[in-house]
């Protein structure tokens, strides 16, 4: 094993707290406390998250991002590069929100992507078609983590997971990376968004125990009610070890 990627028991106690803080900030950012429908923009939420982290004495290791998928969208913003992503979009009822957010504490880093639906006046719950789409995202998470085998390379884990997901009828994309002393830490790279056939070098590195990963991936699914594809984009910290 390599010492930079290996997490100690004490570090994992801290890591759990970092992830909990990250989730709590996202929950608040996506609540009516922060978002005023028809007024608040995606950029407003991004900077609220940044300021919240500063207020509690921590740091972000990258600028938070918030984007929207909606049923009347002509341009599929989730297919754009981050550098070409439109900003200051006003959040409306019926929007599907997505954020990418991570913080740093005691040299450890979180990296999280979560989504939220802005309910319309006649919604009693998240629409079933979105619930089904999220289930597909969760299925891919389960497929990927079930293929974590000590000693297997990142590329082997990637290809086994994609094969299994495709056989299940999913439209997967996996780009999972180690987390630790720096954001994209040392350890095996398990796919990149533009390298779904494997990553030369970093993807050849084996998986060791007592390591942490950003389980980062997405599933594309067609939403008949919106007459378009959407992506369920998820990222959660995961510990592989004893």
Task: Label each PLM-derived region with a short phrase.
Residues 1-242:
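Active-site neighborhoods and metal-handling regions in enzymes and metal-associated proteins
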